[in-house]
Amino acid sequence: MIEYRIEEAVAKYREFYEFKPVRESAGIEDVRSAIEHTNLKPFATPDDIKKLCLEARENRFHGVCVNPCYVKLAREELEGTDVKVVTVVGFPLGANETRTKAHEAIFAVESGADEIDMVINVGMLKAKEWEYVYEDIRSVVESVKGKVVKVIIETCYLDTEEKIAACVISKLAGAHFVKTSTGFGTGGATAEDVHLMKWIVGDEMGVKASGGIRTFEDAVKMIMYGADRIGTSSGVKIVQGGEERYGG
């Protein structure tokens, strides 16, 4: 069934796909509410995470995205706010065993995570091991039922048909979002990739653009081409850029 669904999606892409914006514009509040303020640096300190959380509260961002060891701290810093705590699983390579990813997700939720960004097994995807990729994603989704799971497909390593396959499998496996990049690969988000991903998953799933988004204009472009969330370490700079251009 998985292979058939992929082939069907590829055929539709070849016949009907057209690259064009999915919305006419995006304002400051659209950008603000889409941002997942991110610090996944290997040298991030507790003070760095506290600062990240403070900035997210002050700017009313959707969430913060932190490494697993800082989930509990972020939860404490954001207590009493609507800011979500997002963390990563199988990060950044996606090459962990499936059961390891599932346990990582469980521990993250127990520590206070609201959302999980898991990395797909890129090698298995490129080898067309569709069932493996499906079960890898499904195991994480099932292990944290009720929590949002985003699948990082690492677009910089994939050709168009592989991007389509990754999106189709993520949808079949019950994930809630597909995400462009870890930020540790050879490239980040592009409007072309974001639009393709949204075209494949439709309105039933979200798309998170991440990697190289540093300005207000970058964020607006991603949203106009289909991004529902923006993963960036430049959240404050992005919003300030919008305020300078259009007023607070």
Swiss-Prot record:
InterPro entries noted in UniProt: Aldolase_TIM, DeoC, DeoC/FbaB/LacD_aldolase, DeoC_typeI
Any GO molecular function: deoxyribose-phosphate aldolase activity
Active site per UniProt: D117 (proton donor/acceptor), K179 (schiff-base intermediate with acetaldehyde), K208 (proton donor/acceptor)
Subcellular locations according to the entry: Cytoplasm
Cellular component annotations (GO), alphabetically ordered: cytoplasm
Pathway assigned to this chain's UniProt record: Carbohydrate degradation; 2-deoxy-D-ribose 1-phosphate degradation; D-glyceraldehyde 3-phosphate and acetaldehyde from 2-deoxy-alpha-D-ribose 1-phosphate: step 2/2
Tagged with keyword Metal-binding: no
Record-listed E.C. numbers: 4.1.2.4
Keywords: Cytoplasm, Lyase, Schiff base
Pfam families linked to this entry: DeoC
Reactions performed catalytically: 2-deoxy-D-ribose 5-phosphate = D-glyceraldehyde 3-phosphate + acetaldehyde
GO biological process: 2-deoxyribose 1-phosphate catabolic process; carbohydrate catabolic process; deoxyribonucleotide catabolic process
Role played: Catalyzes a reversible aldol reaction between acetaldehyde and D-glyceraldehyde 3-phosphate to generate 2-deoxy-D-ribose 5-phosphate.
Family under the similarity heading: Belongs to the DeoC/FbaB aldolase family. DeoC type 1 subfamily.
Protein name, UniProt field: Deoxyribose-phosphate aldolase
Gene: deoC
